[in-house]
Amino acid sequence: NRRRFIKECKERGQRPGIYWTPFVDWGGNMNKDVEGTNGKYKYGDIVLKINGQPAQFPGGNKGWALDPTHIGTKMRIDYYIDQWIKDGYEFLKIDFMTHGTFEADSWYDPEVTTGIQAYNQGMKYLSDRIGDKMYVNLSIAPLFPAQYANGRRFACDTYGTMNDTKYALNALTHSW
């Protein structure tokens, strides 16, 4: 239960946080209703298309890129952010942000002509919705624009091998 988790975190002097990917759908069901849209939009309506096909990140993670300019994506943002703020979350790690920068056939907003323009619009919307109610940390995000978050992860995941340790230390020192 989320609310019990949040309460317990705060009782221990910790700040509760949650993880999300606002511009990615991991399910791949293009006929599924988008959360927060009351059935008005399906994932097939809000997914970006490249050469007419739903856009996925190359390499096998299978996340489908969502159009940051689409009203359905923005309604989904409202649905989750409003719920999490009401619940008492204070930290939000948002990941796989590069999906929001994909170059696509087109975007919902016809004024948008590049992936970075779409990303800027979606991130401004998300940032404005959150306001100062949560600390936001970006992962797998473009270095610039950087104004939409309080922090960012500076390297990818590491594990227990010596090569991972070298990678983490190299990232920590910015390749010095």
Q: Which residues are covered by each model-predicted region?
A:
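Short, solvent-exposed loop/turn and secondary-structure capping segments
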Residues: T21, G27-V34, A104, Q147-Y148
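The substrate-binding groove and active-site-proximal loops of carbohydrate-active enzymes
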Residues: N1, P58-R76, T98-A118
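Surface-exposed amphipathic alpha-helices with a cationic face
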Residues: R3-Q14, M123-G131
